[in-house]
Each structure stands twice: as structure tokens, then as C-alpha cells.
Design a protein with these regions (language model features):
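Extracellular/periplasmic metallocenter environments
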Residues: 11, 20-29, 109-126, 130-210
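Extracytoplasmic entry segments of secretory-pathway proteins
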Residues: 1-129
Length: 210
């Protein structure tokens, strides 16, 4: 009888050990995290692509068109963090819809900017919006919910000044995502929305996620 009880007790102990091992190895063990690859993209926005500071295109068929440089076709990895730097050299045009003066879809819900105040003094800080009347351009990817207004260079800033805007956003799965500027900045076109606003390589582009 004693031997039978001993075997029973030993069996119970073994079962308890197996249950604890199962819980420890499977139930409480979290799967690993797959981190996306950070990617940095550096762009320049200019009033005329033929006279840019960083990536001028003097032989461009439309040298007086506004544009993003050096290109508007951007290739990035899927499910990753994209770090953006945009060197904004153009003056203000203004947004027709003040709602788009706000930042959307970025990491932290803001952007960091170095710029010049009304006295021409350099300033720096994190922002969640700008005065919509002072926007020069925007960087917007509607299908990703990303929208960043780009402040125009203050008229009192030193000649050749640049506002530097940095922010980050996350990509989704593979695909081609259209991006564009929403400021009607195309001079000499109908309502400012023709020409470069509708043309790849200027104020419209593709984000190729793969």
C-alpha cells in the first residue's frame, strides 16, 4: 500500500513538473520582435529646379518649375521607419485649407524644424502645426495618413537661407504610394495646380515600398 502511494505521489510530482515546464516554455514565452530597417531620405524643395542650392537641374526642360530634388521616386523597405530631412528653400505660398497646416501621421505626431523668425533670427523646435498662410509646400502621402506642412523661408531671413524639416513615419506593406504637395504653388497655371503639381519629378512622386 505504501509503495502504491509512493508511485502515485511520484506520478503527481512528474505531472506538475511537466505542466510547469509547458507553461514556462510555451505559455509565458513571447515571440521575438521583427524590427523594420530604418531608412533616411534627404530631399530639397525649391522655387525653380534649375537654380537649386543642392541638386540643381540647369538642363531641365522646365528649369523655372518648383520641385522636390533630387527625385520624387523614393524606394523604401516595407514595415520600416523612414527618417526624412527636407531642406526647404522656397518662400510662402499659403494653403487654401487651413486644416492642412497641421502635422499628421509622423512618429510622435510632430516635426522638428530649424527656421528664421520675423526678425531674421534662427530658431529651432518641435512643431505640430504651422501658420497655414506661411506654408511653402507640403509632403503628403494620403494612403499612409502622412501630412507635413513645410514652412516658407521668412522674407527677413538672410539671402540663401533654408528651413530644415525632419520627421519620421512608418511604412506599411509593399505597394506604390502616391505622394504630393497640396500647396497650389505652380505659378502661371490654373489656380496654381497645373504643370509641376501634376508631374512626377517635380511636386508629385511615388513611394515604392518593397
Amino acid at each position: 500500500m505504501v509503495r502504491r502511494l509512493s508511485f502515485t505521489a511520484a506520478g503527481v510530482v512528474i505531472v506538475i513538473i511537466l505542466v510547469i515546464a509547458f507553461v514556462g516554455l510555451f505559455m509565458l514565452r513571447r515571440p521575438g520582435t521583427l524590427e523594420g530597417t530604418p531608412t533616411t531620405i534627404h530631399l530639397e524643395t525649391v522655387a525653380a529646379v534649375g537654380a537649386a542650392n543642392e541638386w540643381p537641374r540647369p538642363d531641365d526642360p522646365h528649369p523655372d518649375w518648383v520641385g522636390y530634388l533630387p527625385t520624387t521616386i523614393l524606394r523604401v523597405p516595407a514595415n520600416s521607419t523612414i527618417n526624412m530631412q527636407i531642406d526647404q528653400e522656397d518662400g510662402a505660398t499659403g494653403l487654401r485649407n487651413p486644416f492642412w497646416g497641421k502635422v499628421f501621421g509622423t512618429e510622435g505626431g510632430n516635426m522638428h524644424m530649424t527656421y528664421f523668425d520675423d526678425k531674421g533670427n534662427p530658431q529651432e523646435g518641435d512643431m505640430t502645426s504651422i501658420d497655414p498662410t506661411q506654408a511653402a509646400h507640403t509632403f503628403a502621402i494620403p494612403d499612409l495618413g502622412v501630412f507635413v506642412p513645410l514652412l516658407g523661408v521668412n522674407s527677413n531671413a538672410p539671402a540663401g537661407s533654408t528651413n530644415v524639416i525632419t520627421f519620421s513615419f512608418k511604412t506599411k506593406g509593399p505597394g506604390i504610394y502616391h505622394w504630393q504637395c497640396f500647396v497650389p504653388c505652380a505659378a502661371k497655371t490654373v489656380f496654381g495646380n497645373g504643370g509641376p503639381m501634376q508631374t512626377l519629378g517635380y511636386m508629385a512622386g511615388e513611394l515604392i515600398v518593397s
